[in-house]
């Protein structure tokens, strides 16, 4: 596709021709004055000069217009799509920036963390007696983010339908050892059956009193291992420590040894034993016959395990055993993600380790400027004292966005009230609300110290904004906010035996528009971890070294996917007889970030979009044709008119687009596009104009040969063949006059030059030159050309094109050689006639109202009588003035010819 710069060059050539024409006119006028023509003719001549100058200005304006048309039009399609939170499960209905014909509801359902069992540590077997540990099942949580359903009515929360992701867990009947929070992950929700819940906690059984002696000096620990050293505590992550131990010498009932944990680690996880004397029972260490070898407890405050031997050891020697205990993060002492020292002391022997906590970020929500964002974590559950309390931390607007009409709902259930033991009411729930000064200082572990200077308590400001209107739901009206808040929840759960499940939801709108409704939710549930140990001894006098068990795999095995149960409702099974030994405990947390997002909203925006049509633009494809341009020569012009139709379309802008297609030259077809604006493509035709230039060939004036030509000139278009002219370029000079016609063809111009030779005959043509015509031609042609091309383009653009063509005309001018002809001015050229029709057709497309300097201008001057100005008296100065004008014109003419000669050289 030719670049528009060709047309600009042609415009410049055209302008040169006109200057030359002005010089020629000056010579003629000067000569006329010299020979004694009256002053009133001189004034009329000046008027003609003004007209010529006006034409020049119009030519410049045409060039400017073509520049404007050629300026690439960047049609930016704003594809406003609904925000979809990839890893948050939300129903996000977002208003697009432009009205859309339909509202798109994008609902992303996340998947839950797979459930898996922590690998069991193989019990150590002695060659004489196998001391078997009371192995405990370690179920992994099956938590997930919620499958949130968008709702525009806050009241619907009470219907339990907006968030669906019930999660229950398989927990063994024995006492819970530790509980860990299961946070929402990115996998689809699953249901697992719950056979027991945190509510059915065994009463604490006091361990054997450590009345004897500390025998750490007689106990040797070995084969210490951590199951893993990196995990995410916010995703119910934890590790296990395992060690073998042997007792040297005799020990008796009541003797004990200890193990101590570092600050960054805890043995109770998220289970709260503050109401149970800060003591957590540990599973007994038993032998193969289920005889208790030692009892154990864990002191929450000192983080110390105490293993107290029973009567079983009184007559035993070579006592050896092993234990495996779960370890968790200490959320207060390790508040941020990172690597911490985890040096564990067992029987006064230090085992140095490091543990890395990769907390899932608590800053979660819909990824858009006014998206709801909230998360929570259950950080303490009392499973032992019978008070059935729990503590929960909620981060509201952790992304610190500017939100309008913000509501937060804290629920004691997730999907169905009857599936959770949570109790949320004015009597069962205490809420404390804090404003965060610096969000970056929030902990990753969800630990929040009420005495922290970064937190400012504002609970009193919300006294009238906290309601319990819906069953098992606390509603908090935050209104318009731009800060982050922490809500500390102290709640209760009942004794129904169901799992404790909670959910928090935030909903808000864009404060600027009152629209763009967004909702995001987060689920929490608790998971139990178990630990225990085994030991034995023998009565043989000759001790035997214990055979160490296989080493613990430090890397956890991949989590198996839980089998989704078709039964949505958990079926709690009756609790079996409680076992006499106190069982380990649990670590609770669970959280699943269910994002309920749903921008649902607003989008209702009436999507008027009728705009869809715009698509039609696509036609622009026609561009490809552009090549066809070449054809344009075929003068398919006839079609040209067809363009007009395309104009009809959308015209205005469409055109602009059409510009793009210029290629469509292939044109006429492109017309079809016209409808779709695609026409705009046609504009691109302007390039096609270039073809039109081939028309210009007509200039080739080859006709010129025919001399008759001049008129034929008009036909000359048919000459388009003239292309052949191109050859003769050398001639360029000879009178390309005919050019005038050729004008139109600007491109051919180059050829025309060649023709011009033939012209030499054509001088006669010079008549035809009627340079003035040429001007007109330029316009006209442009049009005509354009037509032809445009025709092809028919694309509405044609108009624009016509302009562009005009450029092409300019080329023809380039034939400037025609200058020589310039004299002939006779204008007789019928050519001018040819163009005017096109000009007339194209006139409406002239957006700036420029005057097309076509043959019509020349005719007007020829037919209108010169005004009677001045008097008829002879003025002697006229002769002198005429001579000067003639001389000046001659100089201008000579200078121009010299320049032309240099350029051709």
UniProtKB/Swiss-Prot annotation:
Signal peptide residue numbers: 1-44
Membrane topology category: Peptidoglycan-anchor
Gene Ontology CC terms, in alphabetical order: extracellular region
Region of interest (Disordered), residue spans: 44-191, 530-877
Propeptide span(s): 870-905
Posttranslational mods: Proteolytically cleaved by aureolysin (aur). This cleavage leads to the inactivation of ClfB.
InterPro entries attached to this UniProt entry: Adhesin_Fg-bd_dom_2, Adhesion_dom_sf, Fibrogen-bd_dom1, LPXTG_anchor, SDr-like, SDR_Ig, YSIRK_signal_dom
Low complexity biased stretches: 102-119
Any Pfam family hit: Gram_pos_anchor
UniProt domain comment: The Asp/Ser-rich domain functions as a stalk to allow the ligand binding domain to be displayed in a functional form on the cell surface.
Name by which UniProt lists this protein: Clumping factor B
Organism of origin: Staphylococcus aureus (strain MSSA476)
Lineage of the species this protein comes from: Bacteria, Bacillati, Bacillota, Bacilli, Bacillales
């Amino acid at each position: 596709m030719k670049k528009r710069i060709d047309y600009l060059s042609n415009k410049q050539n055209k302008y040169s021709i006109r200057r030359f024409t002005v010089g020629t006119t000056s010579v003629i006028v000067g000569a006329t004055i010299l020979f004694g023509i009256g002053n009133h003719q001189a004034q009329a001549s000046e008027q003609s000069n003004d007209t010529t100058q006006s034409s020049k200005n119009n030519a410049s304006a045409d060039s400017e217009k073509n520049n404007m048309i050629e300026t690439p039009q960047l049609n930016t399609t704003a594809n406003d799509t609904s925000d979809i939170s990839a890893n948050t499960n939300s129903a996000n209905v977002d208003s697009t920036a432009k009205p859309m014909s339909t509202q798109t509801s994008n609902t992303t359902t996340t998947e839950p963390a797979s459930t898996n069992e922590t690998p069991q540590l193989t019990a150590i077997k002695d060659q004489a007696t196998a001391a078997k540990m009371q192995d405990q099942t370690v179920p992994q949580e099956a938590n997930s983010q919620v499958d949130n359903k968008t709702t525009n009515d806050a009241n619907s929360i009470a219907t339990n339908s907006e968030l669906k992701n019930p999660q229950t867990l398989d927990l063994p009947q024995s006492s819970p050892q530790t509980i860990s929070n299961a946070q929402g992950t990115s996998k689809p929700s699953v249901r697992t059956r719950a056979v027991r819940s945190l509510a059915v906690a065994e009463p604490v059984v006091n361990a054997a009193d450590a009345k004897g002696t500390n025998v750490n000096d007689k106990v040797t620990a070995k084969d210490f291992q951590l199951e893993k050293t990196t995990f995410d505590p916010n995703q119910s992550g934890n590790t296990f420590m395992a060690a073998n131990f042997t007792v040297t010498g005799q020990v008796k009932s009541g003797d004990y040894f200890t193990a101590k944990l570092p600050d960054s680690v805890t043995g109770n996880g998220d289970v709260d034993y503050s109401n149970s004397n800060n003591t957590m029972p540990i599973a007994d260490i038993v032998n193969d016959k289920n005889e208790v070898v030692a009892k154990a407890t864990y002191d929450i405050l000192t983080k110390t395990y105490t293993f107290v031997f029973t009567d079983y050891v009184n007559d035993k020697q070579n006592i050896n055993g092993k234990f495996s205990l779960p370890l968790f993060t200490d959320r207060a002492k390790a508040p941020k993600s990172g690597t911490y020292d985890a040096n564990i002391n067992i029987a006064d022997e230090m085992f140095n380790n490091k543990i890395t906590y990769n907390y899932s970020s608590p800053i979660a929500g819909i990824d858009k400027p006014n998206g709801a964002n909230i998360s929570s974590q259950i950080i303490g559950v009392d499973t032992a004292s019978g008070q059935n309390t729990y503590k929960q931390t909620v981060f509201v607007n952790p992304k610190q966005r500017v939100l309008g009409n913000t509501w937060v709902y804290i629920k004691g259930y997730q999907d169905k009230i009857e599936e959770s033991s949570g109790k949320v009411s004015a009597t069962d729930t205490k809420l404390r609300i804090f404003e965060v000064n610096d969000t970056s200082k929030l902990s990753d572990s969800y630990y929040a110290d009420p005495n922290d200077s970064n937190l400012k308590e504002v609970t009193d400001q919300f006294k009238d904004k906290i309601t319990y209107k819906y069953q098992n739901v606390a509603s908090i009206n935050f209104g318009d906010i731009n800060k982050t808040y922490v809500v500390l929840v102290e709640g209760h759960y009942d004794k129904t035996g169901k799992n404790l499940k909670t959910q928090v939801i935030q909903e808000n709108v864009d404060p600027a528009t009152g629209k763009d409704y967004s909702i995001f939710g987060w689920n929490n549930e608790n998971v139990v971890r178990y630990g225990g140990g085994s030991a034995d001894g023998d009565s043989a006098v000759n001790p035997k070294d214990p055979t160490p068990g296989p080493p613990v795999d430090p890397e956890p095995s991949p989590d198996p996917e839980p089998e989704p149960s078709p039964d949505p409702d958990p079926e709690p099974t009756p609790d079996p007889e409680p076992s006499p030994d106190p069982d380990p405990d649990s670590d609770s947390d669970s959280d699943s970030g269910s994002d309920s997002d749903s921008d649902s909203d607003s989008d209702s925006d009436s999507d008027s979009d009728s705009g869809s049509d715009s698509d039609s633009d696509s036609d622009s494809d026609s561009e490809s044709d552009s090549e066809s341009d070449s054809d344009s020569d075929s003068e398919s012009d006839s079609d040209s008119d067809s363009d007009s139709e395309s104009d009809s379309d959308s015209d205005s802008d469409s055109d602009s687009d059409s510009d793009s297609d210029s290629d469509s030259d292939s044109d006429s077809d492109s017309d079809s596009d016209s409808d779709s604006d695609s026409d705009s493509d046609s504009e691109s035709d302007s390039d096609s104009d270039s073809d039109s230039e081939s028309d210009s060939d007509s200039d080739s004036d080859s006709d010129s040969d025919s001399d008759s030509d001049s008129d034929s000139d008009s036909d000359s278009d048919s000459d388009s063949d003239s292309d052949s002219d191109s050859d003769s370029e050398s001639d360029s000079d000879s009178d390309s006059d005919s050019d005038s016609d050729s004008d139109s063809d600007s491109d051919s111009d180059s050829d025309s030059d060649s023709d011009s030779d033939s012209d030499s005959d054509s001088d006669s043509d010079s008549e035809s030159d009627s340079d003035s015509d040429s001007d007109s031609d330029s316009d006209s042609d442009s049009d005509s050309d354009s037509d032809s091309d445009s025709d092809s383009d028919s694309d509405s653009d044609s108009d624009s094109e016509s302009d562009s063509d005009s450029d092409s005309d300019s080329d023809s001018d380039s034939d400037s050689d025609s200058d020589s002809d310039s004299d002939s001015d006779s204008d007789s050229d019928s050519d001018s006639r040819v163009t005017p029709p096109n000009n007339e057709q194209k006139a409406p497309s002239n957006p700036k109202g420029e005057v097309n300097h076509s043959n019509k201008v020349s005719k007007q001057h020829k037919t209108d009588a010169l005004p009677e100005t001045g008097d008829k008296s002879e003025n002697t100065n006229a002769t002198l003035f005429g001579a000067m004008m003639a001389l000046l014109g001659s100089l201008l003419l000579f200078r121009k010819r010299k320049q032309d000669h240099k350029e051709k050289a």
